[in-house]
UniProtKB/Swiss-Prot annotation:
The gene is TOXE. Its main location: nucleus. GO terms for biological process: positive regulation of DNA-templated transcription; regulation of DNA-templated transcription; toxin biosynthetic process. This is Transcription factor TOXE. InterPro entries: Ankyrin_rpt, Ankyrin_rpt-contain_sf, bZIP, bZIP_sf. Residues 228-241 have a biased composition (Polar residues). PANTHER family: ANKYRIN REPEAT AND PROTEIN KINASE DOMAIN-CONTAINING PROTEIN (PTHR24198), ANKYRIN REPEAT-CONTAINING PROTEIN-RELATED (PTHR24198:SF165). Disruption phenotype: Does not affect growth and sporulation but abolishes HC-toxin production and pathogenicity. GO terms for molecular function: DNA binding; DNA-binding transcription factor activity. Residues 212-221 have a biased composition (Basic and acidic residues).
C-alpha cells in the first residue's frame, strides 16, 4: 500500500477549502437572486402591476394602475412626451385647486359652528348669571346650588356657613334628609342640636387602646364650658382643645383612662351640652410611676446611673396598692434582665404582696424557668453567705419566716411554690425546686 506524502495532504485540504468557499459564494448569490425576485413579485402583487418573470413570463395584473392608465392614454392621444408633461401638470393643478376648495369649505363650516356655539354659550352664561346658578359639566345639564341660607345645613365650623361665592342662592334647596356626619353626632338641615344623651352614647363607643391592647395612662385636664362652640353651629369635642385626646403610650396597667357608661362624663353643673370630660377611673395603680428615672435607667441597662439615683434617695422597694414592688412586676412580666438588675441594686427579695405571694410564687405562675433559676441561685448564695440584708428585708415586710424557709413560703391560700408547680403543671420548675431542697411534703 502506497503512502500519502504531507505535501499532497496539504494540497488536498487546500482544494477542499477552496471548493467549499466557491460553493458558499454560489449559494449566497442564488439566495440574493431569489430574494430580489420575491421582493419584485411582492411589490407587483401589492401595487397590482404587471410583472415580467424571467422564467414564468409576463404576469398580467387584474387591473391597471393609475400610472399605467395615464401612460396608455397619453401614448394613444399624445404620443409626444412634452404634451404628456403638460397634461400631468394640468392634472396636478386641478387636484390642488380641488383640495383648496375643500379646505376652504371645511374652515367656513367650522367657523360657523364655532360662532353658533359661542352664541349659545354666551346665552347660556347670561341665563346662569341671571338666575345665580352654578353649572357643572360640558352641556350644563347637571346643576348644583348651595340652597337658601335660611335652610342651610349646620356645620361644625361656623366659618363654613358662608356661601361659596357670597351670593344669596335661592335655587336647589337641599332636602331635609341631607345630613352631615361629624363623627360623634349627625346634624341635618332641620336637625336639632345634639343632646346630652346622644353625645354620651357616642363617647361611650370610643375606645382608647395602646398598640399592645393596654389602656392609656394620662391625667386629662378638664376643659371649661365656655371653650366649646355654640350648639347652633354644631359640635366638635376636640374643637376646644384637641390635645385632650392625645395620650402618651405606656406599658403599664396601673393608671388607665376608661370611658364607661357610669363615668362622670358630664358634671351636674355643666351648662353646655358639648362640654365633655374624660375622667380617671378608680384603678389600682402604684403609688410611684413605673417609668420613673430609676426604672428607666434600669430598663436601659444603665446600672451606674441607677446607683447614682439610689444614692440620691430614689425609692426602690415602694409597694403599690396590691403590695407588689418593682421586683414583683418585673418577675410578673418575665423580664429577666430587669429582675437581675434590681437584685444587683439591692432590691428586697423576700417581699410578698397582700396575697402572700413571693417572687417564687409569681415566677411559677408565669412559667418563667430562667427567673426561677435566678431566684433560687440568689437565694442559695444569700443563705450560704448569711446575707444580713436578706433577713432584714424579710423582717421589714412582716414575714415571720427565716431565710432558710423562703423557698417553702406559703401564701394566704396555703400554697407553696411546689403546690403551684403541681397545680399549673410545671414539671421543669418542680425539678428545679426539688434540686434546691424544696419541701415536697
Amino acid at each position: 500500500m502506497g503512502t500519502t506524502s504531507p505535501n499532497s495532504e496539504k494540497r488536498q485540504i487546500t482544494d477542499i477549502n477552496e471548493r467549499r468557499k466557491l460553493q458558499n459564494r454560489v449559494a449566497q448569490r442564488k439566495y440574493r437572486t431569489r430574494q430580489k425576485t420575491r421582493m419584485k413579485l411582492a411589490e407587483a402583487v401589492l401595487n397590482d402591476y404587471t410583472y415580467i418573470h424571467p422564467t414564468l413570463g409576463t404576469i398580467q395584473s387584474k387591473k391597471k394602475s393609475p400610472l399605467t392608465m395615464e401612460c396608455d392614454r397619453s401614448s394613444a392621444s399624445y404620443p409626444d412626451l412634452s404634451s404628456y408633461a403638460e397634461i400631468c401638470s394640468e392634472t396636478r393643478s386641478e387636484t390642488q385647486a380641488t383640495r383648496a376648495r375643500q379646505l376652504t369649505s371645511q374652515r367656513t363650516c367650522f367657523r360657523e359652528s364655532v360662532d353658533n356655539n359661542q352664541a349659545d354659550s354666551h346665552a347660556q352664561l347670561s341665563r346662569c348669571l341671571n338666575r345665580q346658578e352654578m353649572f357643572y359639566g360640558i352641556s350644563g345639564e347637571t346643576e348644583f346650588s348651595e340652597g337658601d341660607t335660611r335652610d342651610r345645613v349646620e356645620c361644625i365650623d361656623p366659618n363654613l356657613t358662608r356661601g361659596w361665592l357670597d351670593m344669596d342662592l335661592r335655587s336647589g334647596t337641599p332636602n331635609s334628609s341631607t345630613v352631615v356626619d361629624c363623627g360623634l353626632c349627625t346634624v341635618g338641615a332641620n336637625s336639632q342640636p345634639p343632646t346630652r344623651t346622644n353625645v354620651q352614647e357616642a363617647i361611650e363607643t370610643l375606645e382608647l387602646f395602646e398598640p399592645n391592647d393596654q389602656r392609656k395612662t394620662e391625667n386629662l385636664p378638664r376643659e371649661p364650658c365656655g371653650s366649646c362652640p355654640s350648639s347652633s353651629h354644631g359640635y366638635s369635642p376636640t374643637s376646644g382643645n384637641p390635645s385632650t385626646l392625645l395620650l402618651t403610650p405606656s406599658e403599664s396597667l396601673m393608671n388607665s383612662v376608661i370611658v364607661t357608661s357610669d363615668s362622670p362624663l358630664l358634671a351636674a353643673d355643666d351648662k353646655s351640652p358639648g362640654d365633655l370630660v374624660i375622667s380617671e377611673a378608680n384603678t389600682h395603680g402604684p403609688k410611684e410611676d413605673q417609668f420613673s428615672p430609676l426604672m428607666t435607667a434600669i430598663s436601659l441597662g444603665r446600672l451606674d446611673i441607677a446607683r447614682i439615683l439610689l444614692q440620691s434617695g430614689a425609692p426602690l422597694d415602694i409597694p403599690d396598692d396590691s403590695g407588689k414592688t418593682a421586683l414583683h412586676r418585673a418577675v410578673g412580666r418575665r423580664e429577666l434582665h430587669m429582675v437581675e438588675a434590681l437584685l444587683n441594686l439591692g432590691a428586697e427579695m423576700l417581699a410578698t404582696d397582700h396575697e402572700g405571694n413571693s417572687l417564687l410564687h409569681i415566677a411559677v405562675k408565669t412559667n418563667s424557668l430562667s427567673i426561677t433559676r435566678l431566684l433560687l441561685e440568689r437565694y442559695k448564695s444569700c443563705r450560704e453567705l448569711k446575707d444580713a440584708q436578706l433577713g432584714h428585708g424579710c423582717r421589714q415586710h412582716g414575714n415571720q419566716v427565716h431565710s432558710e424557709s423562703w423557698i417553702d413560703l406559703r401564701n394566704r391560700e396555703g400554697m407553696t411554690a411546689v403546690h403551684l408547680s403541681v397545680i399549673f403543671n410545671r414539671p421543669e420548675i418542680l425539678q428545679l425546686l426539688v434540686k434546691y431542697s424544696a419541701n415536697v411534703n
